[in-house]
């Protein structure tokens, strides 16, 4: 392995290979020191290291880009923090994620080669350490990356050049003395790839990692195997926040990153800023702090106490409160990024991670007893960073609204949560880590709240320091794919395998979506499955139903009942086995197809209207287009109001009236993303070099496989027929378009007319008639309640007792009356209410009527059961009822806790 790290550059520059006397890792340096320069092997001593420049975060980003641009790299715009192009990640955790898997797998060329990018990233694995380690850990950070993609026929650069670039950047541009720079040997694995790497460290602080991605990691017979990649990738990650901190030498990284905003947060949260000398003393040992081992913190406090003459408990309190301020500062910027890029907090996916950050921030505010709305702090962040993150400024209204909504929701959760925790403790007598995770996942109850409630009940709960990291790690990854016929199971496995052997089918439905009839050659048939050289039949996909119609060969006609896509091959499913010739005529069921086209184009129109009315956070979560109607699921934090529905319809129909042009065209993926951004990927991200786009002029552009109209006027009109929240953070809209609007209107007219006739009024007076009936009903309810009250009193007077069980027979089948009588009768002893052989039983708490019933019911010849102090039994005769009550009385008397009146 040593050869992987022995470079000509090191020899030429005089760097020697050493072994760290603390951790045993090998590193390369010009210096005489014996440690690798990383923490915890070395404390943070970079405060004493001189530099040429003093860089703000903005300056550090600019200098990084400028340096590598001068070295021949093309700057690339940063991508969203939501990794919607990945099917295994929710968040962008590194700059290389931007190019995985489409570029790193060789499917798509990079946007430039070599390139440089400063990418906002979010990692939640160490969320519990944020604040406590004074800037060593952050949930949100900028990763500077210079990347080179080395193809067999286009080699760019590799280890020698990468290390030289890093060396020059840190020594020449930043001005770090050469003898203090270390290149620590390491090994990197992630995302199915691996390779050797160097960690660039200086005086305790890691400033960059240089990864040489050269292996695919595969598993064979349970053994990990490294297979050389054809495409070798230079994957570097420079900590831009750390570079800013390194050059500014501020007491914490938060001071370097947030500047005046840090002071404002201290003021708003009512927390006095710690003295700089204390922070400097604590931060030097930040690399030694392991919050999962409290004794490491205590050692740091004790040392600071001895040096500064302060009490340990005083230092602990100051550090704890300042840490919470830094945590809130970090989390609110991370939230700003998440929400600005369209995440809607929910209980699944990336929405779950956003909610986790929100709720952890709210708990920090609670611990500080800070009476400050979270939205107020988000607004400070948005205003402070508006020039750096214009998407946050643009989506400010949504960000503040959703945060206020989430804060209210969390407060309601805490009110309900107490009883949930109490019930669980009574049932289990203890709370495990799995219980804590379940309580948080399913009910949103934070672990510290659980611990407080448990303590009141005399139960001790161990809450791991890294609880939120554990929870986040369970929700960091996903698998969401646009399914083809292979995954949908619409075709038998043997047909899928058979279809893979044919060349791609020419797509006439894309060349001319209005083609109703076509000639084609049969190039394969297998039972009732047929493959043509070209087809106008649209295969199911993108939420659009498959076409149906007829395939004719000579005098024979076959119904096309389904069409599926296997890769680039289109399979036609017929109503019977095919026995025709090689030449066929295909005829589309045009009326059905045209309705599908109207609904598909209508869906694109609707999405544009939703984003216009509700905001850019609206993102497709699912869609289905059928001839009858279309369904569109989208991300949004609240159910739609009637006013919003009307506005959405109005906006969509205005675009229909404007008869805007619609065109479908193909662009190279990189060009499509650069021109239209990532909102084109509403229905998933195709892993292809070229992207087919559908554009509604001046309104909407999406990557889409479906068939569309030529202008919006052909949609006719659009009417939303239903909206509902289908899950946390997802709203479903169903709508109809074209002639279906008139059909739906006729259906509603019939319903209104029928209702009017039944209520003996005309449609215009229907609402008034219903209002009048509601008032009548309320009066009737009041009258019934009064009579019921009198009846309860009468029945209580008529009650009898049988061996300690009170009972009464009712001659009215009124469930509410039965329950009211039973409640009153069983307040101090077991009781029964009998209605037509049905016996409802109840008793005071502590009396197990259910158990007694289960023991005697068969013996008596009745049927029934119960649980706790309630039961229901059905008997065929009055004699059996009497026998039942008598035997129950005996059983209840023998119960240890049985009570009788």
Curated annotation (Swiss-Prot):
Co-factor binding details: Binds 1 zinc ion per subunit.
UniProt xrefs under SMART domains: tRNA_SAD
Keyword Methyltransferase: no
Signal peptide: none
GO biological process terms, semicolon-separated: alanyl-tRNA aminoacylation
Pfam family, one: tRNA_SAD
Reactions mediated catalytically: tRNA(Ala) + L-alanine + ATP = L-alanyl-tRNA(Ala) + AMP + diphosphate
Keywords from the named record: Aminoacyl-tRNA synthetase, ATP-binding, Cytoplasm, Ligase, Metal-binding, Nucleotide-binding, Protein biosynthesis, RNA-binding, tRNA-binding, Zinc
EC number: 6.1.1.7
Chain sites annotated for binding Zn(2+): 600, 604, 704, 708
Localization in the cell: Cytoplasm
Membrane-spanning intervals of the chain: none
Molecular functions per Gene Ontology: alanine-tRNA ligase activity; aminoacyl-tRNA deacylase activity; ATP binding; tRNA binding; zinc ion binding
A GO cellular component annotation in the UniProt record: cytoplasm
Domain of life: Archaea
Named cofactor requirement(s): Zn(2+)
Recorded family membership: Belongs to the class-II aminoacyl-tRNA synthetase family.
Notes on the domains: Consists of three domains; the N-terminal catalytic domain, the editing domain and the C-terminal C-Ala domain. The editing domain removes incorrectly charged amino acids, while the C-Ala domain, along with tRNA(Ala), serves as a bridge to cooperatively bring together the editing and aminoacylation centers thus stimulating deacylation of misacylated tRNAs.
Reported function: Catalyzes the attachment of alanine to tRNA(Ala) in a two-step reaction: alanine is first activated by ATP to form Ala-AMP and then transferred to the acceptor end of tRNA(Ala). Also edits incorrectly charged Ser-tRNA(Ala) and Gly-tRNA(Ala) via its editing domain.
Alphabetized PANTHER family for the sequence: ALANINE--TRNA LIGASE, CYTOPLASMIC (PTHR11777:SF9), ALANYL-TRNA SYNTHETASE (PTHR11777)
Protein name: Alanine--tRNA ligase
Species of provenance: Ignicoccus hospitalis (strain KIN4/I / DSM 18386 / JCM 14125)
Lineage: Archaea, Thermoproteota, Thermoprotei, Desulfurococcales, Desulfurococcaceae
């Amino acid at each position: 392995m040593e050869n992987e790290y022995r470079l000509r550059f090191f020899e030429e520059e005089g760097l020697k290979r050493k072994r760290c006397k603390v951790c045993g890792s090998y590193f390369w340096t010009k210096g005489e020191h014996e440690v690798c320069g990383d923490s915890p092997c070395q404390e943070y001593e970079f405060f004493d290291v001189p530099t040429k420049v003093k860089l703000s975060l903005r300056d550090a980003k600019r200098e990084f880009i400028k340096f590598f641009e001068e070295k021949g790299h093309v700057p690339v715009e940063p991508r969203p923090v939501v990794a919607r192009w990945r099917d295994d990640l929710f968040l962008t955790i590194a700059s290389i994620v931007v190019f995985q898997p489409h570029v790193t797998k060789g499917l798509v060329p990079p946007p430039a080669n070599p390139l440089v990018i400063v990418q906002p990233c979010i990692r939640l694995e160490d969320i519990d350490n944020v604040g406590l380690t004074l800037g060593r850990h952050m949930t949100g950070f900028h990763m500077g990356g210079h990347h080179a993609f080395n193809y067999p026929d286009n080699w760019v650069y590799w280890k020698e050049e990468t290390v030289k670039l890093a060396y020059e950047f840190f020594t020449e541009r930043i001005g770090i003395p050469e003898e203090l720079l270390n290149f620590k040997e390491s090994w990197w694995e992630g995302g199915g790839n691996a390779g050797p790497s160097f960690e660039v460290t200086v005086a305790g602080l890691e400033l960059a990692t240089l990864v040489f991605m050269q292996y695919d990691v595969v598993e064979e017979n349970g053994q990990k195997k490294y297979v050389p990649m054809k495409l070798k990738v230079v994957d570097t990650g420079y900590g831009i926040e750390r570079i800013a901190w390194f050059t500014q030498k501020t007491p914490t990284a938060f001071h370097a990153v947030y500047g005046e905003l840090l002071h404002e947060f201290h003021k708003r949260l009512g927390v006095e800023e710690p003295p700089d000398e204390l922070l400097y003393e604590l931060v030097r040992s930040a690399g030694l702090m392991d919050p999962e081992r409290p004794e490491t913190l205590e050692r740091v406090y004790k040392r600071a106490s001895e040096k500064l003459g302060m009490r340990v408990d005083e230092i602990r309190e100051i550090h704890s409160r300042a840490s919470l301020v830094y945590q809130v500062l970090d989390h609110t910027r991370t939230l700003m990024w998440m929400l600005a890029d369209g995440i809607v907090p929910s209980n699944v996916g990336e929405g779950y991670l956003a909610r986790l950050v929100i709720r952890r921030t709210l708990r920090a505010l609670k611990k500080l007893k800070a009476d400050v709305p979270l939205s107020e702090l988000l607004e400070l962040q948005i205003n402070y960073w508006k020039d750096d993150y214009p998407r946050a400024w643009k989506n400010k209204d949504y960000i503040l609204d959703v945060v206020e909504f989430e804060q209210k929701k969390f407060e309601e959760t805490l009110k309900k949560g107490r009883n949930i925790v109490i019930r669980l403790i009574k049932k289990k007598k203890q709370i495990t880590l799995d219980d804590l995770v379940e309580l948080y996942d399913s009910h949103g109850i934070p672990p510290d709240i659980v611990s407080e409630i448990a303590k009141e009940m005399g139960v001790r709960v161990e809450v791991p320091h890294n609880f939120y990291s554990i929870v986040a790690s369970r929700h960091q990854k996903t698998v969401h794919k646009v399914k083809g016929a292979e995954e949908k199971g619409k075709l038998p496995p043997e047909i899928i395998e058979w279809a893979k052997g044919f060349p791609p089918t020419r797509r006439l439905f894309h060349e001319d979506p209005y083609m109703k009839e076509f000639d084609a050659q049969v190039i394969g048939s297998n039972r009732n499955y047929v493959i043509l050289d070209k087809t106008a039949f649209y295969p199911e996909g993108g939420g659009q139903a498959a076409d149906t119609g007829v395939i004719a060969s000579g005098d024979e006609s076959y119904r096309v009942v389904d069409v599926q896509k296997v890769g680039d091959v289109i399979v036609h499913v017929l109503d019977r086995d095919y026995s025709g010739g090689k030449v066929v005529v295909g005829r589309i069921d045009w009326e059905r197809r045209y309705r599908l086209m109207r609904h598909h184009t209508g869906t694109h129109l609707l999405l544009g209207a939703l984003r216009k009315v509700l905001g850019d956070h609206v993102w497709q979560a699912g869609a289905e287009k059928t001839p009858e109607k279309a369904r569109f699921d989208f991300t949004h934090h609240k159910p739609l109001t009637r006013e919003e529905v009307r506005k959405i319809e109005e906006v969509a129909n205005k675009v229909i009236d404007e008869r805007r042009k619609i065109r479908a065209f193909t662009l190279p993926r990189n060009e499509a993303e650069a021109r239209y951004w990532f909102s084109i990927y509403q229905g998933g991200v195709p892993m292809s070099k070229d992207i087919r786009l559908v554009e509604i002029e001046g309104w909407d552009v999406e990557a889409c496989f479906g068939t569309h109209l030529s202008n919006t006027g052909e949609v006719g009109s659009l009417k939303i027929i239903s909206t509902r929240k289908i899950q946390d953070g997802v709203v479903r809209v169903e709508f109809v378009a074209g002639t279906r609007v008139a059909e739906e209107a006729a259906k509603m007219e019939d319903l209104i007319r029928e209702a009017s006739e039944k209520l003996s009024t005309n449609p215009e007076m229907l609402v008034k008639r219903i209002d009048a009936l509601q008032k009548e009903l309320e009066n009737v309810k009041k009258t019934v309640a009064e009579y019921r009250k009198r009846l309860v009193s009468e029945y209580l007077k008529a009650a009898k007792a049988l061996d300690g069980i009170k009972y009464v027979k009712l001659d009215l089948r009124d469930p509410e009356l039965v329950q009211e009588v039973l409640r009153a009768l069983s307040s101090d002893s077991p009781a029964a209410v009998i209605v037509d052989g049905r016996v409802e039983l109840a008793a005071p708490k502590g009396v197990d009527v259910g158990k007694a019933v289960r023991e005697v019911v068969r013996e008596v010849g009745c049927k029934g059961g119960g649980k706790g102090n309630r039961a229901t039994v059905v008997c065929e005769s009055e004699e059996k009822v009497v026998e039942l009550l008598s035997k129950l009385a005996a059983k209840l008397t023998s119960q240890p806790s049985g009570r009788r009146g």
